[in-house]
Design a protein with these regions (language model features):
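Transmembrane helix-boundary elements of multi-pass transport/secretion proteins
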Residues: 1-57, 65-75, 108, 154-186
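Residue-identity detector for threonine
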Residues: 30-33, 60, 98, 143
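Membrane-spanning alpha-helical segments of multipass transporters and channels
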Residues: 70-186
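Transmembrane alpha-helix boundary and packing residues in multipass membrane permease domains
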Residues: 16-20, 60, 64, 94, ...
Length: 186
């Protein structure tokens, strides 16, 4: 359960900060510039991506040291998965901020995103749940990050061994980037 909690905290904190930042700029009118929507999205992904990189790395290292977790695999692999999940959370936060018209409304999206991640991503074992609940889990990015983190931390898997999970997370990232570019309002 500890590996998926690392992923959960990375997802939650990056999602929260990224969504609020873009929304604040959109509401204040500072996005009304002649740049393309794709440039805004890529700029946010780059700028906040550096923050996501630092935050994911910090949460991972502090979580492992603070909880005295024994890692059978590579800590570098754990950080790679956490950072990739951080980028997915960043893109997801930006996407949801395009639908919000106020910070209060953005805060209302948080339970809609966080609660399913808690119940259906593997924090509570999916194999003990009904089929419909397991299907919901298969459409959540934290499920794949949790599986990869668990395999690396508890079984010593390498990045090649969790390639399917990495591929799914990358697909989530690309789809979310495309949706961000198409859906961004100024």
């Amino acid at each position: 359960m500890v590996p998926i909690l690392i992923g959960f905290f990375v997802f939650f904190f990056v999602f929260l900060i990224s969504g609020m930042a873009l929304l604040k700029e959109r509401i204040s009118g500072t996005l009304a510039t002649p740049v393309k929507r794709s440039e805004i999205v890529y700029g946010y992904m780059l700028g906040y991506g550096l923050m996501a990189l630092a935050q994911a790395s910090l949460i991972t290292v502090v979580g492992i040291k603070l909880l005295d977790i024994e890692i059978i695999g590579s800590i570098f692999s754990v950080i790679i998965i956490a950072v990739l999940l951080g980028f997915v959370a960043l893109a997801f936060g930006i996407l949801l901020s395009t639908f919000a018209s106020s910070e209060f409304q953005m805060m209302q999206f948080i339970p809609l995103v966080v609660v399913p991640q808690i119940f259906f991503s593997g924090i509570i074992p999916l194999d003990s749940m009904a089929d419909w609940a397991q299907r919901i889990g298969k459409i959540l990015p934290l499920t794949y990050a949790g599986e990869a983190l668990s395999a690396i931390i508890m079984q010593g898997a390498g990045l090649i061994d969790v390639g399917k999970d990495i591929l799914v997370l990358m697909i989530f990232l690309v789809v979310l980037l495309i949706l961000n570019i198409l859906g961004l309002k100024r």
